[in-house]
Swiss-Prot record:
One of its GO terms (biological process) is regulation of division septum assembly. The keyword Acyltransferase does not apply. It comes from Brucella anthropi (strain ATCC 49188 / DSM 6882 / CCUG 24695 / JCM 21032 / LMG 3331 / NBRC 15819 / NCTC 12168 / Alc 37). Belongs to the MinE family. The gene is minE. InterPro entries: MinE, MinE_sf. This is Cell division topological specificity factor. Gene3D superfamilies: Cell division topological specificity factor MinE. SUPFAM superfamilies: Cell division protein MinE topological specificity domain. The keyword Nuclease does not apply. Prevents the cell division inhibition by proteins MinC and MinD at internal division sites while permitting inhibition at polar sites. This ensures cell division at the proper site by restricting the formation of a division septum at the midpoint of the long axis of the cell. It comes from the Bacteria. Keywords: Cell cycle, Cell division.
Length: 89
């Protein structure tokens, strides 16, 4: 480390790069919002279908994006008497 570097300002490139990455991630998330919800819905249905039978029309997946936090809301109407699937050994 030279004496000149000791008194110089730290490079702002890493901070700018990090800010740009956050901005790009936010932009991508806002454009792919509907695709992400559809993919999540199908994956959640696949996992639940391994264990019980449900009506696919009775599942609701909603994503709300806020400034500081995003919320994923999943509503699943389960039948009163469920038929558990037995795993083959």
């Amino acid at each position: 480390m030279s004496l000149f570097r000791f008194f110089s300002k730290p490079a702002s490139a890493p901070q700018a790069r990090e800010r740009l990455q956050v901005l790009l991630a936010h932009e991508r998330a806002s454009h792919e919002h509907s695709d992400l919800v559809a993919v999540l819905r199908e994956e959640i249905l696949a996992v639940i279908a391994k264990h019980i039978q449900i009506d696919r029309d009775k599942v609701s997946v909603k994503m709300d994006r806020g400034d500081q936090m995003s919320t994923l809301e999943v509503d699943i109407e389960l039948p009163l008497k469920t038929k558990a699937k037995v795993r083959a050994a």
